[in-house]
């Protein structure tokens, strides 16, 4: 609730002197900055400034040093963590390369087994071809022998027929 100010001679209430209407300048204040004019009025003593600076430093310096040390420790811990992370990454890569190597060995085993089977089949085919060659040779020899025997038989029959044929007798 506001308290009415002194009344005017005609009895109307007036506003207090500290209340201003919008847009009215404040009496006694200028449009300049509050810091203007202070520098001229204030004389600075070097000793006071030095003591204030020392006090300010003594108040904030321990916290700043602790913060600096904490930051250094954090930086060192980060470096250690980065090194550890790099080592783990290299181990992970080695594991992947080991998996690749294991896969290659498994594939090599598979192809080795295939080669062994192919070798067995080739040996078996070689044995079969050798047996077939021997059999073919024997059959060829048998045919040649049979042909020779037939030829000899024909010659014998021819000789026999020749002997059986009538010959004119010789006159003596």
UniProtKB/Swiss-Prot annotation:
Topology with respect to the bilayer: Peripheral membrane protein
Top-level division of the source organism's lineage: Eukaryota
UniProt keyword list: Albinism, Coiled coil, Cytoplasm, Disease variant, Hermansky-Pudlak syndrome, Membrane, Phosphoprotein
Distribution of this protein across tissues and organs: Widely expressed.
MF annotations from Gene Ontology: actin filament binding; identical protein binding; molecular adaptor activity; protein homodimerization activity; syntaxin binding
Keyword Plastid listed: no
Entry PTM: Phosphorylated.
Coiled coil: 63-167
Region feature (Disordered): 1-36, 135-172
Compositional bias ranges of the Basic and acidic residues kind: 143-164
Compartments where found: Cytoplasm; Membrane
InterPro entries noted in UniProt: BLOC-1_pallidin, Snapin/Pallidin/Snn1
Any one Gene Ontology BP term: protein targeting
Cellular component terms per the entry's GO annotation: axon cytoplasm; BLOC-1 complex; cell-cell contact zone; contractile ring; cytoplasm; cytosol; endosome; filamentous actin
Homology family: Belongs to the BLOC1S6 family.
Subunit structure: Interacts with BLOC1S4 and DTNBP1/BLOC1S7. Homodimer. Component of the biogenesis of lysosome-related organelles complex 1 (BLOC-1) composed of BLOC1S1, BLOC1S2, BLOC1S3, BLOC1S4, BLOC1S5, BLOC1S6, DTNBP1/BLOC1S7 and SNAPIN/BLOC1S8. Octamer composed of one copy each BLOC1S1, BLOC1S2, BLOC1S3, BLOC1S4, BLOC1S5, BLOC1S6, DTNBP1/BLOC1S7 and SNAPIN/BLOC1S8. The BLOC-1 complex associates with the AP-3 protein complex and membrane protein cargos. Interacts with BLOC1S5, F-actin, SNAP25 isoform 1 and isoform 2, SNAP47 and STX12.
Disease: Hermansky-Pudlak syndrome 9: A form of Hermansky-Pudlak syndrome, a genetically heterogeneous autosomal recessive disorder characterized by oculocutaneous albinism, bleeding due to platelet storage pool deficiency, and lysosomal storage defects. This syndrome results from defects of diverse cytoplasmic organelles including melanosomes, platelet dense granules and lysosomes. Ceroid storage in the lungs is associated with pulmonary fibrosis, a common cause of premature death in individuals with HPS.
Function (record text): Component of the BLOC-1 complex, a complex that is required for normal biogenesis of lysosome-related organelles (LRO), such as platelet dense granules and melanosomes. In concert with the AP-3 complex, the BLOC-1 complex is required to target membrane protein cargos into vesicles assembled at cell bodies for delivery into neurites and nerve terminals. The BLOC-1 complex, in association with SNARE proteins, is also proposed to be involved in neurite extension. May play a role in intracellular vesicle trafficking, particularly in the vesicle-docking and fusion process.
Protein name per UniProt: Biogenesis of lysosome-related organelles complex 1 subunit 6
Gene: BLOC1S6
